[in-house]
Amino acid sequence: MLLSLILPTYNVEAYLGKCIESCLNQDLPKSEYEIIVEIDGSPDHSINIAKRYQENNDNIKIITRENGGLSAARNTGLKAANGEYVWFVDSDDSITENCLKAIYEEMTQYNLDALWLKWCNMNKFHNIIPLYDCTLCKEDDEIHEGLDFMCSVMGIYYFAWSFVFKRNFLIDNGFLFKEGLFYEDTEFAYRVLPAAKRIKLFCKVCYTYNIRQGSIAQTISSKKSFSDKKRARGC
């Protein structure tokens, strides 16, 4: 198994179908990658949507669990994954058509622990908004160590879905997402990336982030979230 796409799913029935379809519209044989849809105690009809796609696609695996939050869902998905590489995909977003083969080839050609992916944003009117021009992407073949990568690309945001990881790199080092924490992506990145020996920028848009109300990123506004943000950055 080459790749595992891990889709934590909670209350996203309006978006899940599009996300799964984007994961199916790929240039790898279905036998070479799996789509793990993890229903995290979702009260809507997400599980029915996932089952409908599973009927005709043997590479879709459905996991159901009591609601434990995004970090717990990602951890469960990681432990269930069989792929050599893993990609955490938010189930209200989508990935670019026919991007998996190039991602896999990049990971294997350079023997990477992590590959940073370029992405774009989509607003509620379905307009695509380029994030920014990444001047560092001119360095297509440069391999970074973890701390060097973080120092070189301080302007880059760290989201779980903006990286593809070698699964054994995460498992062997015991890297899991901390549960019950806002800004878990940032905390995860600041803890994981320094341990990576080989990281590379992949300067093709592979991911579309769906800007919407109701997501964690759009609703954080509490003292706890402020404290967690400082903690995530090591402050």
Q: How would you label these PLM feature ranges?
A:
Residues L70, S91-K200, N210-K223:
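Donor-binding/catalytic cores of nucleotide-activated saccharide
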Residues R65-A81, S91:
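Glycine-rich, basic loop-to-helix element that forms the pyrophosphate-binding segment
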Residues V205-R212, T219-C235:
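Catalytic core of nucleotide-sugar-dependent glycosyltransferases
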Residues Y33, N59-K61, L112:
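Short, conserved active-site loop motifs that form the nucleotide-linked donor/cofactor pocket
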Residues S22, I39-N48, E66:
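A conserved acidic beta->alpha catalytic loop
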Residues V12-Q26, I49:
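Short, well-formed alpha-helical segments that are part of the catalytic scaffolds
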Residues L2-S4, T9, S22, E34, ...:
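Cell-envelope/extracellular polymer assembly enzymes that use nucleotide-activated donors
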Residues V86:
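Short aromatic/hydrophobic "clamp" motif used to bind/position activated sugar donors
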